[in-house]
């Protein structure tokens, strides 16, 4: 360490170019140069470019070693294979041409000799194996999807080929034969386009399965959706509910009339009234019903003779109830509860 002390002289060029570790490890100097006032240490921002340049030089050196390695073309080939998975055909073609060029360069590098860095050799082999396994993982779902579509196409083809006895198939085949004979007699070549084939396939499938589809549609249309009733039907039920709020229990005749006017069945009407009574109806106590039927004049009697007022109130209630036919506005049920 003492031999490096002269490098720390402030007036020496070597002192400015010496590493930072030397200046930190040797705070004192035995140089014979004249003493100068101690200057402030250089800011960290001034040292960053040197560190960055050193890091860049080290990175460039590692890249150069990797690119000059004999396994570098194989590494690029594995990377290109990963990029080819799921790529469009034109991109795959360009990548394949690039891979061919890399193969020719790989032969030249192999003839030049092997690398002398075992650690770098292990790194290259490990990274190549990792890329190969990654390509296999990428390829597996694509292969499964391709196999699925092939199976579906085979099933559709079997559907079209098995329909030799159907009327639609015979008519289409007859038309094709007749059309082919006319074109052959005219000396014109037969022209088939993908769009025409698709239309023919659609018409063929419709002719074969139209009966099944129509029956299925009728079956689905019969099943009514669960949930809210039609708006008009609910309005009619609510109107009846408002008229018979004191006792909202329709009779069988009224249920039949509601079913005819709303277009609902008896089960739907029963369920609607059950839910409506559970949510929006509270039975009124009988005492309150009688009190509501009592005339206003009967309430003025009081205080002097309780018995007289009671008898008078009772007679008033009876008189008030006379002539009422309980068509839903009374306190008693009209129909079956």
UniProtKB/Swiss-Prot annotation:
Q: Where is the composition biased (Low complexity)?
A: 27-38
Q: According to its UniProt record, what is one Pfam family this protein matches?
A: KNOX2
Q: Keywords on this record?
A: DNA-binding, Homeobox, Nucleus
- Which Gene Ontology cellular-component terms appear in the entry? nucleus
Extract the CDD domains matched here: homeodomain
Where is the protein localized? Nucleus
Q: Which domain of life is it from?
A: Eukaryota
ELK domain location: 200-220
Q: Name one GO molecular function term.
A: DNA binding
Residue ranges the UniProt entry marks as DNA-binding: 221-284
Region Disordered, annotated ranges: 1-56, 159-190
SMART domains named among the record's database cross-references: ELK, HOX, KNOX1, KNOX2
Family listed: Belongs to the TALE/KNOX homeobox family.
Name of the molecule in the record: Homeobox protein knotted-1-like 4
Organism listed in the record: Oryza sativa subsp. japonica (Rice)
